[in-house]
Amino acid sequence: QYGTISDSYREIKLLALFLNDFGEDMASLRSEIPTIRILPGDMHTVRTACRHDADHGYVFFNNYQRRWKMDDHPQVKLEGLLDGKASVGFPAFDLKEGMYGFFPYNMKLNDAVLHTALATPLCVLHTKKGDAFVFYGDLDPQIQWEGDARAELCLISRQEALNAWKVHLDQDYLVLSENYVWEENGELVVTGSGKTMIAVYPAVEKGIVDFKECGKRGNFTLYERIYKAQEPEAELVCKEQDKEKAVYELKLAYPGEKNYHDAFAFLTWYGNRMEVFDGEEKINDYFYTGQEALLSLGYFEFPEKLKLVVYPLHPGDPIFLEKQPDAADGCACKIEKLHVETIFR
């Protein structure tokens, strides 16, 4: 909402980056699933499958089931299938509960052939020094090549991959940032708070507008941007509370120059639902999920006063929640805390 990045978006971006550079190859391969039938209630057996031809492929593994505890599997050895040939063996690794993904085997990377890797391909960077192939994962990758040819690899963690953005300026770059990154008129644009740190590979030759180089982390160059701004002032007061609802008044002030793009109000609240009013107009509402409520002040032209109404959630209400809020007073119906964060670009 309001242009923020969800966890689902980050997961989809992982797949989109892979498919953009490697999807044509994967789509041409046939799928093969082991003939053993694994029932949905089986929490003990590792799920595997392959997409492959006679020369190369990808092995998929899954040890995750939502809301179920899966067994850990120490020293698992995956096998990549090939048409009419012996399977390709992977080095052993500990497959923990909750892990899932896929690994390549006999993967052609320009003139080199990557025999096996306990890491997942993300994208290709076409740089002035040649192609760099980005792989991610949290295991020791145990890279194994066929023959003497080698390709340039850039290895990152899965969390870094979730925060990865591929952009093209004078060449391709991989930018690691928790916020949005894109190219605009030949420049790198990065959203973020007053203090924003990014990691870039390879280093940007002409620098990045408003960012200063501040160090190295492996193959990546670190850049930092610091904007000084007077943060919006927020005061939240409970004006009314009864069995039906709790009514809050949120007063906002914006001292100094608004040199920021937006300001987000984050509300920790408990209840069934919450409504936000600007005067008599309802501008947003929320259903309780256990997460903070996010409200863009810039989207609503930086209002100075808002009314927030929280409706109670009672124990036993027919609403599914993975984690129930505290109902010490017989119900959950309150805003516990608020903070405001400015956003720059």
Language-model-detected regions and their locations in the chain:
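Short beta-strand-plus-loop segments that form exposed binding edges in beta-rich domains
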Residues: 308-316
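Short strand-turn-strand beta-turns centered on an Asx-Gly dipeptide
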Residues: 83, 146, 277-283
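Aromatic-lined ligand-binding clefts that engage carbohydrates, nucleic acids, or primary amines
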Residues: 256-279, 286
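Edge strands and adjacent loops of beta-rich recognition modules
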Residues: 114, 222-250
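A short acidic/small-residue loop/turn micro-motif
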Residues: 284-292
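Carbohydrate-binding surfaces of carbohydrate-active enzymes
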Residues: 1-207, 343
